């Protein structure tokens, strides 16, 4: 396969060779390709067909008065692994302070909210045994399944296309 098919896009839109991806991401991608998807969506599901949708955050909230995400204490190993994955996917990238972890979430068109200053470019990757579920950024459809993508979630409208199966996404940001 080619880098365009398997690679990660850097800040300049250049493809990073698949051989440079984190071995764990490559292994997860191969496992997912060998499984068939089951029907699911972000808003309706049948028992055994993907399950409920939801989102939570991990990381460090800015400012002294902000409560830290509960996900940090509920899932410390996941938090550590997710931040390590960001470094493995994009070693050139300034490490993020937060990660949104989403399961079977189908987001409507939106821009991310925040304090309005200092936010970083978002990094997203899709994981799981699903079909569909592409990310649309300013009307351009992007396949993020086991392919990391950087985009400006604070200024660019983005949303999730319908999907079938179990879909996770990790979104790193500051």
Question: Model-derived features: where do they sit?
Answer:
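Fe(II)/2-oxoglutarate oxygenase catalytic core
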Residues: 1-148, 154-174
């Amino acid at each position: 396969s080619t880098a365009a098919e398997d690679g990660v896009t850097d800040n300049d839109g250049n493809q990073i060779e698949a051989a440079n991806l984190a071995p764990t991401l490559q292994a997860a991608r191969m496992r997912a390709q060998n499984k068939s998807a089951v029907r699911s969506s972000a808003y309706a599901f049948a028992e055994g067909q993907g399950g409920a949708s939801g989102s939570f955050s991990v990381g460090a909230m800015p400012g002294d008065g902000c409560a830290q995400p509960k996900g940090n204490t509920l899932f410390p190993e996941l938090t550590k692994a997710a931040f390590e994955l960001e470094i493995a996917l994009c070693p050139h990238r300034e490490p993020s302070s937060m990660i949104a972890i989403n399961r079977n979430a189908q987001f409507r068109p939106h821009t991310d909210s925040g304090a309005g200053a200092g936010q970083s470019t978002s990094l997203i990757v899709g994981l799981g045994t699903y079909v569909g579920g592409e990310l649309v950024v300013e009307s351009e459809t992007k396949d993020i399944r086991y392919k990391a993508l950087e985009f400006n979630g604070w200024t660019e409208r983005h949303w999730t296309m319908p999907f079938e199966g179990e879909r996770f996404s990790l979104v790193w940001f500051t």
